[in-house]
Amino acid sequence: MCSRRRIYSSLIVGGYAVQENGYARFTSNVDIVVPNVAEARDVLSIKGFRENPGSSMTVTDRISKVEVVLLPGGGSVGPGPLKLPLPIAVSPQPNIADLRTLVEIKLSSYLGSPMSRNQDLSDVIALIKANQMPENFELNSAVSPKYAEVWSELKHEERSSSGN
């Protein structure tokens, strides 16, 4: 995230990061983890983004109409077991969450609210397939059991559908 005077640390997560990590899917917004949501919202508002009434965490690009969801780095937005990473990398280019970070965020979000965060589990399944992720993919211990369960179920389905 940039302004004329300062470049801010940020991390792109969500559907856009899923696309950048190997699974193309449509998303109508961009989720960005920032160190300070209020400051980021103020900077983006000054840069021409429209503040969304009723939400302290979203702004909309006036030209493209893309909604930007600002997420609190080091904090959480739901009851999942992991906190969001605190972005420290500063770059004029977008910092996209790597595969490990993205899968951890998605699994944590799903575990915290499985009925309303089902897309997060679907994203993890798609990422496992698209990246041919191994069974022993190293993840935070708070989410690794769920990853192992999902990976095992996927392999079971593959074996069943291939007739083995």
Model-inferred region functions:
Residues 1-164:
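Compositionally biased terminal segments of proteins
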